[in-house]
Amino acid sequence: MSILEINNLHVSIEGKEILKGVNLTLKTGEVAAIMGPNGTGKSTLSAAIMGNPNYEVTQGQILLDGVNILDLEVDERARLGLFLAMQYPSEIPGITNAEFMRAAMNAGKADEDKISVRDFITKLDEKMALLGMKEEMAERYLNEGFSGGEKKRNEILQLLMLEPKFALLDEIDSGLDIDALKVVSKGVNEMRGKDFGAMIITHYQRLLNYITPDLVHVMMDGRIVLSGDAALATRLEKEGYAGIAQDLGIEYKEES
């Protein structure tokens, strides 16, 4: 079992503090949902864990199996088994999907450990079929001209190919219709097992109807203020964040 620990994490952007002391433990074998209103720091948390240089960690630790990874670059964190599926994936002209994924799978490996072309194609075909993706998607430039739904499927395809220890899934349900949501959820559920953990960031219960979390954490004002099981997400759907904030004595203003 691998453990990702976030201890008293404070993160600022351009001098403004966004995370104000986050404490969180993720374990392989578990799926945790991070829920909360807009602007509360959910995406900042995933970016800080992955090492985005635009986010300054001013205090705290991020430990992967007991080792503080704060001084590691993004690619080093990825090689240790961290994966981030972004809400708005970048387009990279000139590099095909297949080229990108094979390079990512072989990064940092000795020649004898690199996946062969044959094994790569076999695995790629299998995972694309699982997600209902056309074969031509493999030869298109990375995310270039992709629809929102295609980009999200492509992020999950990368997840299935790379098989990380921990996936940070930042609003993968954003902008998806119900059919695309089911496909994306199917891909995430395919990964579930004792060697995989996930942190799913979402505003809504809808995604969690298809990916049942083991744990639900509610973020407000840069902190985790409440934790529970899947029933907590259902409660949020009924009461909204205002009800939770009132119970906890937290000042909260609903968006108009």
Curated annotation (Swiss-Prot):
Keyword ATP-binding: yes
GO cellular component: plasma membrane
MF-aspect GO terms: ATP binding; ATP hydrolysis activity
Domain of life: Bacteria
Pfam families attached to this UniProt entry: ABC_tran
Compartments, as annotated in UniProt: Cell membrane
Main localization, broad class: membrane
Membrane topology category: Peripheral membrane protein
Start and end residues of each ABC transporter domain: 4-246
Binding site for ATP: 36-43
Matching InterPro entries: AAA+_ATPase, ABC_transporter-like_ATP-bd, ABC_transporter-like_CS, FeS-cluster_ATPase_SufC, P-loop_NTPase
CDD domains found in the cross-reference section: ABC_FeS_Assembly
Family under the similarity heading: Belongs to the ABC transporter superfamily. Ycf16 family.
PANTHER family named in the record: ABC TRANSPORTER I FAMILY MEMBER 6, CHLOROPLASTIC
Name of the protein described by the UniProt record: Probable ABC transporter ATP-binding protein M6_Spy0273
